[in-house]
Amino acid sequence: EEYLLIDFADTSQYLSAQNFTDNVINVAMPSTYRFLEKVIDEIGRMYQDAGVELPAFHVGGDEVPEGIWEGSAICRTFMKEHGLTKIRDLKDYFLEQILEMLDKRNIQAVGWQDIVMNPDNTVNEHFRNSKVLNYCWNTIPEQGGDEVPYKLANAGYPIILCNVGNFYLDMAYCYHVEEPGLRWGGYVDEYVTFDMLPFDIYKSLRRNLKGEPVDVKTASNGKQPLTKEGCQNIKGLSGQIWSETIRSFEQIEYFLFPKVFGLAERAWNAQPSWALSSDNKIYMDAKRKYNAGIVNYELPRLAKRGINFRISPPGIIVRDGLLLA
């Protein structure tokens, strides 16, 4: 019972995004916090033994389903003892404890955007002055998520942009039925990663979830703009590749290359010249130059090293009743 994470008498009914009904720990139990301290300290010792610093610790915290803890008598008693009025106040309390644990150990706390957002996608002001670094992943326009990064940055929260629509590298390259990868966040190829604009995020996706073209000139209409102060809170970019559907390292290489070149390009040059111009020709010229670098230099280099990568299949187009290759 020293590291027990769940209340066996909890009758809460919920379903997570992954269709789990029991994947949330009970934050009202002292054993939960003993477990967390144990994990943090054990990982810290691994770094210490290796002679390197543990600079940051990612606490996760995303996609916590509605309905958790509602059937836990332990949680209800805990709320009364600590003056908490809403179930979601437990989440704030939990995060406070983790932040304190990490701060005492001089470790930067990192988490997904969900931990500092309210269920209605508004900013949770409770953590405005916290030191947590927030990874913004759920930025799908159709779900209203594309405004979240700038909401947080403008409110003073430091963020890392890891947009699912641009930087989730386990997404399929295209919508073809035989193309491996997930599709819930759209498709991601080497051009979608290249298109990411940290300081003009609404222009980062040129197609919607259905694969239909997006007018980038009007994509930001009515959306939260990034302020001058908010710009200072964008601390970096991150690409993710989730492995639950990947069965070999060769597959990992397939998803990484050539997608990752766009991530590297944008991390190196966060505000390319074409982003500041309304002339689409400038963008197309930059895209052609980028593609030429991949085809003429990067892919041959990977091939020499025996690294697996994806080559786009031949393309066709129907124009004026003719099939052109």
Language model segments and positions:
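Short, active-site-adjacent cap segments at secondary-structure transitions
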Residues: 65-67, 118
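Substrate-binding groove of N-acetylhexosamine-processing glycoside hydrolases
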Residues: 29-37, 41-48, 52-57, 77-324
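Glycine-rich beta-strand-to-loop/alpha-helix junction loops that act as flexible
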Residues: 60-63
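Aromatic- and acidic-residue-enriched carbohydrate-binding clefts of CAZyme catalytic domains
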Residues: 1-31, 67-92
